[in-house]
């Protein structure tokens, strides 16, 4: 990870955020949850990365049993401003289903997510939790997943900078990645309205390893590109879930996306890839994604634009479009014209 200056501004800012970190959960008590007519089993875990404890969360239809046939594993990778469970297991009473974890657990997947260093329930540190550090976090987390599930290769979904983390991980640990879904992804960031605006703060990101995050900032995720593509209740529910975990988040991914792109070389990504872009997403142009897509060496690849969607395809009004294309990609039948490895 790149070392950041430890100037007074960063230290004083860190003192305001409090401890925030969660101790090792190892395997916290499991919980059976009833959602409508469907029940789900869930459990908390922790991964250890040196002195850093990384919070992990798992959800599936039923509790695992000894000797069962392992389910396909889907690992969900969060973005720059929010942690794992609020992003992927959000409850918005009276406004429909928003939990990507429950949706794919219902499809028969063993679904996991985590909080990266400095986010949510994971340890607070003086690091900036950049993309390279995220790869190390994913290594520690997948060690736990592989131990608990017996699966050696996992499906990954990453949204926004979560896609950059997942893509970078797929390059470093290709043997752990089965199929890879990258949503709200950016390659070079050229002509990106969001990143052009964000780059105005690049010196702040260099000088400070954390940035403030309040309710209005969380709301803006759903309004900055195209108002009306998400339910206002989602931003409020997300803020309610996220703000008790802290009023700041690391700056590392913002710095990488403002000054260090590209961080994922498509020529080095071996896994099958699905690129998903919301029609109005300001983080990357279609041409930027096409340039990435055409360089991918695996011909098992798809690029899909979802109409009526903005940056957050996970939590948009038309999120069921994401579920549809993602399920089809993850359950793609094996090819019959090539010999499969034994």
For each feature predicted by the language model, list its residue ranges.
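N-terminal secretory signal peptides
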Residues: 1-12
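Conserved alpha/beta-hydrolase "acid-adjacent" motif
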Residues: 282-288
